């Protein structure tokens, strides 16, 4: 016997169910009638992946973002595995929803999009253009204040809300909402997203996890929890990685045919899916999708 009263109350590894007879597995015979402990089989309320560290190891993180600490990268030394794992704990469903392949695909998609946003790569870069994600932590062009008049999220005097962090969080209304969710005053302190490495990752994961009408969350799309409406279908928005690009930057990149930025997002995503050994899914681009909010 491996678990339960037959084994001194031991729990099964990996969140598996302990059957009435003291054996570990996650099938109905073990998790059903008589099950002694962990009777959701590791699926739990959030999904089939026990913890994020089992989906993306430190060594995988380092290989995915292998040139982020290059001397030429402005963000060198900023983005760390520990900061990522720490930030993700504030969002228990992130990277842990669905079966293991779904969890891996979500992490590949998150890093695919954020690597594009922070890339330092170029077509002939060492190890290819998709090994240079997370080279930047702030938008290169900081001339714009990204301030949209908002009574709910007023711009602070002298502050700019240009892109910062992995997702390049932009605009006062995003800083305001994100700050509320994280318990931080990001309207007055937007630089925290580029100076505190845990807050930086938290802001990116917050954006990923949070729907903003009429857009679903990136998380719900990649985990298969988003069902397009008839309106979405007529606008070409079908489930897949392409809809996530539409959520993030559809107004500039989607619905107008081929776009190098979209291809770059796809290139990172495919590299990471290949590293995780998972399929890409369908509908990777957004070339025939109307941007959200425009139809």
Curated annotation (Swiss-Prot):
<comment type="function">
    <text>Probable inactive chitinase-like protein that does not exhibit hydrolytic activity toward chitin. May bind chitin and be involved in plant defense against fungal pathogens.</text>
</comment>
<feature type="disulfide bond">
    <location>
        <begin position="35"/>
        <end position="39"/>
    </location>
</feature>
<dbReference type="GO" id="GO:0050832">
    <property type="term" value="P:defense response to fungus"/>
</dbReference>
<dbReference type="InterPro" id="IPR001002">
    <property type="entry name" value="Chitin-bd_1"/>
</dbReference>
<feature type="domain" description="Chitin-binding type-1">
    <location>
        <begin position="1"/>
        <end position="41"/>
    </location>
</feature>
<dbReference type="InterPro" id="IPR000726">
    <property type="entry name" value="Glyco_hydro_19_cat"/>
</dbReference>
<dbReference type="InterPro" id="IPR016283">
    <property type="entry name" value="Glyco_hydro_19"/>
</dbReference>
<feature type="disulfide bond">
    <location>
        <begin position="254"/>
        <end position="286"/>
    </location>
</feature>
<feature type="disulfide bond">
    <location>
        <begin position="12"/>
        <end position="24"/>
    </location>
</feature>
<dbReference type="GO" id="GO:0006032">
    <property type="term" value="P:chitin catabolic process"/>
</dbReference>
<protein>
    <recommendedName>
        <fullName>Probable inactive chitinase-like protein LaCIC</fullName>
    </recommendedName>
</protein>
<feature type="disulfide bond">
    <location>
        <begin position="3"/>
        <end position="18"/>
    </location>
</feature>
<dbReference type="GO" id="GO:0004568">
    <property type="term" value="F:chitinase activity"/>
</dbReference>
<feature type="disulfide bond">
    <location>
        <begin position="73"/>
        <end position="135"/>
    </location>
</feature>
<dbReference type="GO" id="GO:0005975">
    <property type="term" value="P:carbohydrate metabolic process"/>
</dbReference>
<feature type="disulfide bond">
    <location>
        <begin position="147"/>
        <end position="155"/>
    </location>
</feature>
<dbReference type="Pfam" id="PF00187">
    <property type="entry name" value="Chitin_bind_1"/>
</dbReference>
<dbReference type="InterPro" id="IPR036861">
    <property type="entry name" value="Endochitinase-like_sf"/>
</dbReference>
<keyword id="KW-0020">Allergen</keyword>
<keyword id="KW-1015">Disulfide bond</keyword>
<dbReference type="GO" id="GO:0008061">
    <property type="term" value="F:chitin binding"/>
</dbReference>
<dbReference type="InterPro" id="IPR023346">
    <property type="entry name" value="Lysozyme-like_dom_sf"/>
</dbReference>
<comment type="similarity">
    <text>Belongs to the glycosyl hydrolase 19 family. Chitinase class I subfamily.</text>
</comment>
<feature type="disulfide bond">
    <location>
        <begin position="17"/>
        <end position="31"/>
    </location>
</feature>
<dbReference type="Pfam" id="PF00182">
    <property type="entry name" value="Glyco_hydro_19"/>
</dbReference>
<keyword id="KW-0611">Plant defense</keyword>
<keyword id="KW-0147">Chitin-binding</keyword>
<dbReference type="GO" id="GO:0016998">
    <property type="term" value="P:cell wall macromolecule catabolic process"/>
</dbReference>
């Amino acid at each position: 016997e491996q678990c339960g009263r037959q084994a001194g109350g031991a729990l099964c590894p990996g969140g598996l169910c302990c059957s009435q007879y003291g054996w570990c597995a996650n099938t109905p015979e073990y998790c059903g009638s008589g099950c002694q402990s962990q009777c959701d089989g590791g699926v739990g309320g959030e999904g089939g992946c026990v913890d994020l560290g089992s989906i993306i190891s430190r060594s995988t993180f380092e290989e995915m973002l292998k040139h982020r600490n290059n001397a030429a990268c402005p963000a060198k030394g900023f983005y760390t595995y520990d900061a990522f794992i720490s930030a993700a704990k504030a969002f228990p469903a992130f990277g842990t929803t669905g079966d293991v392949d779904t969890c891996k695909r979500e992490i590949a998609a998150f890093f695919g999009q954020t690597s594009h946003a922070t890339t330092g790569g170029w077509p002939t870069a060492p190890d290819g253009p998709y090994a240079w994600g997370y080279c930047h932590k702030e938008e290169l062009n900081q001339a714009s204040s990204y301030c949209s008049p908002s009574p709910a999220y007023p711009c602070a005097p002298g502050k700019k809300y240009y892109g910062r962090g992995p997702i390049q969080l932009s605009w006062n209304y995003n800083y305001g909402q994100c700050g509320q969710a994280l318990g931080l005053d990001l309207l007055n302190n937007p630089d925290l997203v580029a100076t505190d490495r845990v807050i930086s990752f938290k802001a990116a994961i917050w954006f990923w996890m949070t729907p903003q009408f009429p857009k679903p969350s990136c998380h719900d799309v990649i985990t298969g929890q988003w069902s397009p409406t008839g309106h979405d279908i007529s606008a070409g928005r079908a489930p897949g990685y392409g809809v996530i690009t539409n959520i993030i930057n559809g107004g500039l990149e989607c619905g107008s045919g081929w776009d190098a930025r979209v291809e770059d997002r796809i290139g990172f995503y495919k590299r990471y899916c290949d590293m995780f050994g998972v399929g890409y899914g369908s509908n990777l681009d957004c070339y025939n999708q109307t941007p959200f909010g425009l139809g």
